[in-house]
Amino acid sequence: MPAVATFHLLRWQNTLGMVQALVFDRVRYRRTTGLQFLRVLGTGKGSSTAPGTEFGRTALFCLFDDEQSADAHIAQVARRNGLAESWHVKLRGAGGHGSWHGVQIPRIMHDASLPPAPGPMAFITRANIRARSWRAFSRDAAIIDRELHHSDGLLAVVGVGEAPILRLGTFSVWRDVAAMTTFAQRQPEHNRVVVRTRSERWYGEEMFARFTPYWSTGSWDGRNPLDAA
Protein backbone atom coordinates (compact mmCIF):
# COMPACT_ATOMS: atom_id res chain seq x y z
CA MET A 1 0.00 0.00 0.00
CA PRO A 2 1.45 3.42 -0.96
CA ALA A 3 2.37 5.83 1.81
CA VAL A 4 0.02 8.67 2.74
CA ALA A 5 1.24 12.24 3.23
CA THR A 6 -0.38 14.97 5.29
CA PHE A 7 0.17 18.71 5.34
CA HIS A 8 -1.01 20.89 8.21
CA LEU A 9 -1.12 24.69 8.33
CA LEU A 10 -1.47 25.89 11.92
CA ARG A 11 -2.18 29.41 13.11
CA TRP A 12 -1.53 29.95 16.81
CA GLN A 13 -3.28 32.31 19.19
CA ASN A 14 0.04 33.94 20.02
CA THR A 15 3.72 33.88 19.10
CA LEU A 16 4.53 31.71 22.11
CA GLY A 17 2.43 28.90 20.65
CA MET A 18 4.38 29.13 17.41
CA VAL A 19 7.74 29.05 19.19
CA GLN A 20 6.73 26.06 21.30
CA ALA A 21 5.57 24.19 18.19
CA LEU A 22 8.82 24.85 16.34
CA VAL A 23 10.91 23.81 19.34
CA PHE A 24 8.99 20.81 20.66
CA ASP A 25 6.91 19.28 17.84
CA ARG A 26 9.75 17.11 16.56
CA VAL A 27 9.87 15.45 19.96
CA ARG A 28 6.09 15.50 20.38
CA TYR A 29 5.42 13.52 17.22
CA ARG A 30 8.51 11.37 16.72
CA ARG A 31 6.87 8.33 18.34
CA THR A 32 3.67 8.65 16.28
CA THR A 33 2.50 5.25 15.05
CA GLY A 34 3.23 4.68 11.37
CA LEU A 35 5.23 7.90 10.91
CA GLN A 36 7.98 7.58 8.29
CA PHE A 37 8.98 11.20 7.85
CA LEU A 38 8.27 14.50 9.62
CA ARG A 39 9.24 18.10 9.03
CA VAL A 40 8.24 20.94 11.34
CA LEU A 41 8.18 24.17 9.36
CA GLY A 42 7.94 27.89 9.80
CA THR A 43 5.97 29.85 7.22
CA GLY A 44 6.42 32.94 5.09
CA LYS A 45 4.43 36.14 5.39
CA GLY A 46 0.86 35.72 4.20
CA SER A 47 0.84 34.05 0.81
CA SER A 48 4.30 35.30 -0.12
CA THR A 49 6.85 32.70 -1.18
CA ALA A 50 9.76 35.15 -0.90
CA PRO A 51 12.02 34.85 2.18
CA GLY A 52 10.32 36.11 5.34
CA THR A 53 8.59 34.84 8.47
CA GLU A 54 5.00 35.05 9.68
CA PHE A 55 5.05 34.89 13.45
CA GLY A 56 2.17 32.90 14.88
CA ARG A 57 1.94 30.29 12.11
CA THR A 58 3.66 26.94 11.53
CA ALA A 59 3.25 23.94 9.24
CA LEU A 60 3.86 20.19 9.34
CA PHE A 61 4.59 17.79 6.52
CA CYS A 62 4.30 14.11 7.42
CA LEU A 63 4.56 10.78 5.65
CA PHE A 64 2.75 7.72 7.04
CA ASP A 65 2.71 4.01 6.38
CA ASP A 66 -1.05 3.90 5.98
CA GLU A 67 -4.37 5.74 6.09
CA GLN A 68 -5.18 4.78 9.68
CA SER A 69 -1.95 6.28 11.01
CA ALA A 70 -2.52 9.47 9.02
CA ASP A 71 -6.08 9.84 10.33
CA ALA A 72 -4.99 9.38 13.94
CA HIS A 73 -2.30 12.02 13.53
CA ILE A 74 -4.68 14.53 11.94
CA ALA A 75 -7.07 14.12 14.86
CA GLN A 76 -4.22 14.62 17.31
CA VAL A 77 -2.95 17.79 15.63
CA ALA A 78 -6.43 19.29 15.22
CA ARG A 79 -7.04 18.97 18.97
CA ARG A 80 -3.96 20.99 19.94
CA ASN A 81 -4.50 23.66 22.55
CA GLY A 82 -3.71 27.20 21.49
CA LEU A 83 -4.75 26.92 17.86
CA ALA A 84 -6.62 29.86 16.36
CA GLU A 85 -7.07 28.16 12.97
CA SER A 86 -5.89 24.99 11.27
CA TRP A 87 -6.10 23.32 7.89
CA HIS A 88 -5.27 19.67 7.26
CA VAL A 89 -5.05 17.74 3.99
CA LYS A 90 -4.30 14.15 2.99
CA LEU A 91 -2.19 13.65 -0.12
CA ARG A 92 -1.50 10.83 -2.56
CA GLY A 93 1.75 10.87 -4.49
CA ALA A 94 1.52 11.96 -8.13
CA GLY A 95 5.14 12.10 -9.25
CA GLY A 96 8.07 14.45 -9.04
CA HIS A 97 11.77 14.20 -8.40
CA GLY A 98 14.45 14.91 -5.83
CA SER A 99 14.77 14.35 -2.12
CA TRP A 100 14.22 15.96 1.27
CA HIS A 101 17.12 15.31 3.63
CA GLY A 102 17.98 12.25 1.63
CA VAL A 103 14.43 10.86 1.59
CA GLN A 104 13.02 10.49 -1.91
CA ILE A 105 9.41 11.41 -1.16
CA PRO A 106 8.18 11.19 -4.80
CA ARG A 107 9.66 7.71 -5.20
CA ILE A 108 8.27 6.43 -1.89
CA MET A 109 4.79 7.71 -2.72
CA HIS A 110 4.74 6.60 -6.35
CA ASP A 111 1.90 4.25 -7.27
CA ALA A 112 1.99 3.17 -10.90
CA SER A 113 -1.45 1.59 -10.56
CA LEU A 114 -3.17 4.96 -10.12
CA PRO A 115 -3.99 6.95 -13.28
CA PRO A 116 -3.43 10.74 -13.25
CA ALA A 117 -6.27 12.24 -11.24
CA PRO A 118 -8.33 15.13 -12.62
CA GLY A 119 -9.05 18.12 -10.46
CA PRO A 120 -6.99 19.94 -7.83
CA MET A 121 -3.31 19.25 -7.38
CA ALA A 122 -0.89 20.16 -4.60
CA PHE A 123 2.81 20.79 -5.07
CA ILE A 124 5.78 21.02 -2.76
CA THR A 125 9.02 22.60 -3.84
CA ARG A 126 11.94 22.77 -1.42
CA ALA A 127 15.68 23.23 -1.51
CA ASN A 128 18.83 23.53 0.53
CA ILE A 129 20.24 26.76 -0.88
CA ARG A 130 24.00 27.17 -0.93
CA ALA A 131 25.17 30.14 1.15
CA ARG A 132 27.01 31.64 -1.81
CA SER A 133 23.74 31.68 -3.79
CA TRP A 134 21.53 33.20 -1.08
CA ARG A 135 21.63 36.79 -2.30
CA ALA A 136 20.75 35.85 -5.87
CA PHE A 137 18.04 33.46 -4.66
CA SER A 138 16.43 36.11 -2.44
CA ARG A 139 16.32 38.67 -5.22
CA ASP A 140 14.85 36.32 -7.80
CA ALA A 141 12.41 34.72 -5.33
CA ALA A 142 10.62 38.05 -4.96
CA ILE A 143 10.28 38.34 -8.75
CA ILE A 144 8.92 34.81 -9.08
CA ASP A 145 6.48 35.44 -6.24
CA ARG A 146 4.88 38.32 -8.14
CA GLU A 147 4.63 36.20 -11.28
CA LEU A 148 3.13 33.31 -9.29
CA HIS A 149 0.35 35.42 -7.82
CA HIS A 150 -0.78 36.49 -11.28
CA SER A 151 -1.10 32.88 -12.44
CA ASP A 152 -4.51 31.57 -13.42
CA GLY A 153 -5.56 28.51 -11.43
CA LEU A 154 -3.58 29.14 -8.24
CA LEU A 155 -5.92 28.40 -5.31
CA ALA A 156 -3.55 28.92 -2.38
CA VAL A 157 0.17 29.08 -1.62
CA VAL A 158 2.39 29.43 1.41
CA GLY A 159 6.14 29.67 1.79
CA VAL A 160 7.62 27.16 4.23
CA GLY A 161 11.03 26.59 5.71
CA GLU A 162 13.02 24.55 8.18
CA ALA A 163 15.00 27.72 8.90
CA PRO A 164 14.48 31.41 8.06
CA ILE A 165 17.15 31.17 5.38
CA LEU A 166 18.83 28.53 3.18
CA ARG A 167 16.29 25.71 3.74
CA LEU A 168 13.11 26.96 2.14
CA GLY A 169 10.21 25.75 0.04
CA THR A 170 6.59 26.26 -0.96
CA PHE A 171 3.30 24.40 -0.64
CA SER A 172 0.72 25.32 -3.25
CA VAL A 173 -2.73 24.16 -4.35
CA TRP A 174 -3.82 24.52 -7.97
CA ARG A 175 -7.07 24.06 -9.87
CA ASP A 176 -5.47 21.25 -11.89
CA VAL A 177 -2.10 20.05 -13.12
CA ALA A 178 -2.47 22.04 -16.35
CA ALA A 179 -2.59 25.32 -14.43
CA MET A 180 0.61 24.52 -12.56
CA THR A 181 2.31 23.30 -15.74
CA THR A 182 1.42 26.53 -17.51
CA PHE A 183 3.06 28.54 -14.75
CA ALA A 184 6.12 26.32 -14.59
CA GLN A 185 6.76 26.22 -18.33
CA ARG A 186 5.43 29.47 -19.77
CA GLN A 187 6.28 32.21 -17.28
CA PRO A 188 9.45 33.90 -18.54
CA GLU A 189 10.94 34.90 -15.19
CA HIS A 190 10.31 31.48 -13.71
CA ASN A 191 11.99 29.81 -16.66
CA ARG A 192 14.96 32.16 -16.45
CA VAL A 193 15.46 31.43 -12.76
CA VAL A 194 15.17 27.65 -13.23
CA VAL A 195 17.94 27.77 -15.83
CA ARG A 196 20.06 29.89 -13.52
CA THR A 197 19.62 27.61 -10.50
CA ARG A 198 20.97 24.70 -12.53
CA SER A 199 23.79 26.45 -14.34
CA GLU A 200 25.04 28.15 -11.15
CA ARG A 201 24.28 25.18 -8.87
CA TRP A 202 22.31 27.16 -6.30
CA TYR A 203 21.01 24.09 -4.46
CA GLY A 204 22.75 21.39 -2.50
CA GLU A 205 19.53 19.35 -2.51
CA GLU A 206 16.11 19.96 -4.00
CA MET A 207 12.71 18.34 -4.42
CA PHE A 208 9.65 18.94 -6.57
CA ALA A 209 6.72 16.73 -5.64
CA ARG A 210 3.18 16.51 -7.00
CA PHE A 211 0.25 15.29 -4.93
CA THR A 212 -3.44 14.62 -5.34
CA PRO A 213 -5.31 16.11 -2.36
CA TYR A 214 -8.22 13.79 -1.63
CA TRP A 215 -9.46 14.87 1.80
CA SER A 216 -9.23 18.09 3.78
CA THR A 217 -10.70 19.79 6.81
CA GLY A 218 -10.44 23.13 8.56
CA SER A 219 -9.65 26.52 7.08
CA TRP A 220 -6.71 28.40 5.61
CA ASP A 221 -7.12 32.15 6.08
CA GLY A 222 -10.82 31.66 6.70
CA ARG A 223 -11.57 29.22 3.87
CA ASN A 224 -10.78 25.77 2.57
CA PRO A 225 -8.98 26.38 -0.75
CA LEU A 226 -10.12 23.02 -2.11
CA ASP A 227 -13.73 24.19 -1.88
CA ALA A 228 -12.94 26.66 -4.68
CA ALA A 229 -11.70 23.96 -7.05
For each of these PLM feature ranges, what is it?
Residues 50, 198-199:
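Short proline/glycine-enriched turn/loop segments at secondary-structure junctions
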Residues 1-58, 67-73, 82-163, 167, ...:
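Short S/T/G/P-rich N-terminal loop/turn motif that feeds into the first structured element of a domain
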Residues 168-195, 202:
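Glycine/small-residue-rich hydrophobic helix-like segments
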Residues 63-65, 174:
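Signature tryptophan residues that serve as conserved aromatic anchors
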Residues 77:
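Catalytic-core segment of enzymes that process non-peptidic bonds
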